């Protein structure tokens, strides 16, 4: 069975908001633009049933596929919330790198292709990312029950009381986010890194409060260590409060240890899932920084000198060499290295969703094509990739790191 990722202006206009994210009747397909036609290569689907779930995931994440879009959905950790395995992030892009018109087009195409998860933060573009996201959601008039919005709280302003994870800032910061988003609630509010100045009990109580007040459905952590997450869970259980359901963590071919050795243990013990970001290592895996830093690329932006240095460093050059070695595998699967890298992230135990960062429709469609690659990542192929990378973590590492 082959799933066509078709998207044209006509199909976008013809489908009502009630149809989106719901199975639709097949069309003639004459006006559709398939993934293959947008230059992106996808693997032959005849080899395996597209709905077949990898054995690695079948006993871990309950996964389903909507035939009309090909999108896969998973539970967020062991909660009941169903999220698309690919989500759309807004870091760097919304309110900054791209225009509001481009942002709207990206959200529309993503939503039409089954993406139901949109991630942002109060700090992104000094709040403009939330404003842009909220403005688009209001304009599109999609059913609020059909999508998931997540935001992150920590850096809200310059005043001492406008940042961190104090009860004051968690509550006031989330209220500010809701105002910018023009929403009554967010589905998940994340603590955007740990705050050493705020007691854990205060953080958990504040998160429980905003959930009980209807300002959020769930709460999670971002850039927290496994020990910190376990402490939050223990505090929640001790005082009959609400524990976190998810950790946002960086995860890609060259950043593996936390997601592969620490978070799976938390998933099995306390049900905390993983929502991962930067699957392409801020573009390093795409090959755009092989020789120089292109204009208008992320590494050329003000404040991203660290990325430029990383791209041209000796370590960056070694990583480029590893990526080149992955090309034959991608060729065998009839996909791009970008699609292979994203599918590789999706195959990891306990990963509920991978957040995408894109600045144009072509990138988005290519990234979405990773879903078709996922069923073809056999244990043998994963082992072959591990041998090329040479960085498979020791599964017995101390989870306190």
UniProtKB/Swiss-Prot annotation:
Pfam families per the UniProt record, alphabetical: Aldo_ket_red
SUPFAM superfamilies named among the record's database cross-references: NAD(P)-linked oxidoreductase (SSF51430)
Subunit structure, as described in the record: Forms heteromultimeric complex with alpha subunits. Identified in potassium channel complexes containing KCNA1 and KCNA2.
Family from the record: Belongs to the shaker potassium channel beta subunit family.
InterPro entries: K_chnl_volt-dep_bsu_KCNAB, K_chnl_volt-dep_bsu_KCNAB-rel, K_chnl_volt-dep_bsu_KCNAB3, NADP_OxRdtase_dom, NADP_OxRdtase_dom_sf
A GO molecular-function annotation: potassium channel regulator activity
GO biological process, one term: regulation of potassium ion transmembrane transport
Alphabetized NCBIfam families for the sequence: Kv_beta (TIGR01293)
Organism, as annotated: Xenopus laevis (African clawed frog)
Composition bias type Polar residues, residue spans: 1-14, 32-41
Top-level taxon of origin: Eukaryota
This protein's name: Voltage-gated potassium channel subunit beta-3
Start and end residues of each stretch annotated as Disordered: 1-49
One GO cellular component, as annotated: cytoplasm
Entry keywords, A to Z: Cytoplasm, Ion channel, Ion transport, NADP, Oxidoreductase, Potassium, Potassium transport, Transport, Voltage-gated channel
Function noted in UniProt: Regulatory subunit of the voltage-gated potassium (Kv) channels composed of pore-forming and potassium-conducting alpha subunits and of regulatory beta subunit. The beta-3/KCNAB3 subunit may mediate closure of potassium channels. Increases and accelerates inactivation of Kv1.1/KCNA1 and Kv2.2/KCNA2 subunit-containing channels. May display nicotinamide adenine dinucleotide phosphate (NADPH)-dependent aldoketoreductase activity. The binding of oxidized and reduced NADP(H) cofactors may be required for the regulation of potassium channel activity.
Gene label: kcnab3
């Amino acid at each position: 069975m082959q799933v066509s990722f078709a998207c044209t202006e006509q199909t976008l206009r013809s489908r009502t908001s009630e149809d989106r994210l719901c199975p639709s009747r097949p069309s003639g397909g004459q006006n559709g633009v398939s993934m293959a036609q947008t230059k992106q290569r996808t693997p032959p689907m005849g080899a395996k049933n597209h709905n077949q779930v990898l054995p690695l995931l079948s006993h871990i994440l309950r996964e389903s596929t909507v035939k009309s879009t090909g999108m896969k959905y998973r539970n967020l950790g062991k909660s009941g919330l169903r999220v698309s395995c690919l989500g759309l992030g807004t870091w760097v892009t919304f309110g900054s790198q791209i225009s509001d018109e481009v942002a709207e087009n990206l959200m529309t195409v993503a939503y039409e292709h089954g993406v139901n998860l949109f991630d942002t933060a109060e700090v992104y573009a000094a709040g403009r990312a939330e404003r842009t996201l909220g403005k688009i959601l209001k304009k599109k008039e999609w059913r609020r029950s059909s999508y998931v919005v997540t935001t992150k709280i920590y850096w809200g302003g310059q005043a001492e009381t406008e940042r961190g994870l104090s009860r004051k800032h968690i509550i006031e910061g989330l209220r500010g986010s809701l105002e910018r988003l023009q929403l009554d609630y967010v589905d998940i509010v994340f603590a955007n890194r740990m705050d050493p100045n705020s007691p854990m009990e205060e953080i958990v109580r504040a998160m429980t409060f905003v959930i009980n007040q209807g300002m959020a459905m769930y709460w999670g952590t971002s850039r927290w260590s496994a020990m910190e997450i376990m402490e939050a869970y223990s505090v929640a259980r001790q005082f009959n409060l609400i524990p976190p359901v998810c950790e946002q963590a960086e995860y890609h071919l060259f950043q593996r240890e936390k997601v592969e050795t620490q978070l799976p243990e938390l998933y099995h013990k306390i049900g905390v899932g993983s929502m991962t970001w930067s699957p392409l290592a801020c573009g390093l895996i795409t090959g755009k920084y092989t020789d120089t830093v292109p204009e208008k690329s992320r590494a050329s932006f003000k404040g991203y000198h660290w990325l430029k240095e990383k791209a041209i460093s000796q370590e960056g050059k070694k990583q480029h060499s590893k990526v080149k070695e992955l090309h034959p595998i991608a060729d065998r699967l009839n996909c791009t290295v970008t699609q292979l890298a994203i599918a590789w992230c999706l195959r990891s135990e306990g990963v509920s969703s991978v957040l995408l960062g894109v600045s144009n429709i072509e990138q988005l469609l290519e990234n979405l094509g990773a879903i078709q690659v996922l069923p073809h990542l056999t244990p043998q192929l994963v082992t072959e990739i591990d041998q090329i990378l040479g960085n498979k973590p020791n599964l017995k590492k101390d989870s306190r790191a």
